[in-house]
């Protein structure tokens, strides 16, 4: 029995805390995807360094990469996820330690002194130490994968919020320019009406067009404020930090879209959430084996007993005194009697009513549940990768269609309508209808480009991990594009 215990202690060993708190694996896995610095803030110096870098990045015009880096340094939710990783490491180290023995001492006093000591050790915990340590190590590795997933998710949310905010700002800028033009035309119509050169109905059409553009601008400004607040939350910004500058427009479309070869295989092998699920499944398999092996014994304690007794006694002796007259002399001699006793005590549970079947069945069903969920996740990952790539390609084609076809045609139509109006070949109604259609087309073109960049983020997360935030349906940008 004791040989087995010593073997278990030797093989199990004791895990220790890593110097980086498990962050090296997180940094290594996310670095190849994000190309950004991933930092866990542990001290005031770390916090000061992170804030200094955030301040430097905020002093420049915001870019998508800078937004991601700021989020990785400044998002407290992400730091909380890294703290969860530290908790998992502490649990792993704790699971690798042998159980501490229980020591009890008892003392009785009377005619003597009686001392009793008892050392109780959980032998079952010692025998299963190595298995429990391996399970804890698997769960720590799963926690690392979850930290990778949290990092990728934070980066993806920052990119999405950035693209939405820039697109909203670009729409506001465009509508402000359109409003200035509409205001000038409205003032001109008013002056022409005062001279009688323009009928009142034509004046009203100019004025309502100006009012419509103003209403669109107000809604766009409201949306911009909302999108900037979402970006602030994603980046963890507040106070003066929110006074950053956004670029005037979204980036141009790439010359060619990314290929979609092997996206399903890449998703199944690369996604951090699937890796965490696989490691958790391994831990559950080991837990199931341990539960099955110990199903008959739930408690096994060994106690080392020792008792020390010291009693005060009196030795009595008698002697005969021969002197006349002869007398019997009684002699009392004080003495101490000391007794040492040693023993061993075994305590175990007799499985009269519970033969471990309930625990075994629970472990088995939990394991099978994890198997089915992992398979479901893998199937869903394949589908999500296909769906994300389809949306990516469709949004690219739609945004390119706006840039290459719709906007140039709208510009040509506007020029021809203006020439026809100046030559009195068309009326003001046709000119205003074309202006409305041109504004709509430009706004939709900006939204289509925004949807492409959002689809790019979704495609990346579908393959590498980080969750899905969803994008606007590509067809939404096309609605009404050909109208007018």
How would you label these PLM feature ranges?
Residues 1-70, 221-266, 312, 317, ...:
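Terminal intrinsically disordered/low-complexity segments used for targeting and assembly
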Residues 15, 145-268, 391, 395, ...:
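Periplasmic alpha-helical coiled-coil/stalk elements that build and connect Gram-negative outer-membrane
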Residues 51-60, 101-128, 132-133, 246-256, ...:
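Small/polar, glycine/serine/threonine/aspartate-rich low-complexity segments that form flexible
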Residues 73-80, 86-101, 117-135, 144-152, ...:
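A glycine-/polar-enriched beta->alpha junction
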Residues 82, 137, 200-209, 428-436:
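Short, charged, amphipathic alpha-helical segments
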Residues 116-118, 162, 264, 343-345, ...:
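Membrane-embedded beta-strand positions in outer-membrane beta-barrel channels/transporters
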Residues 199, 381, 388, 424-427:
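Alpha-helical heptad-repeat coiled-coil segments that mediate oligomerization/polymerization in large
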Residues 212-239, 407-465:
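Short segments within alpha-helical structural elements
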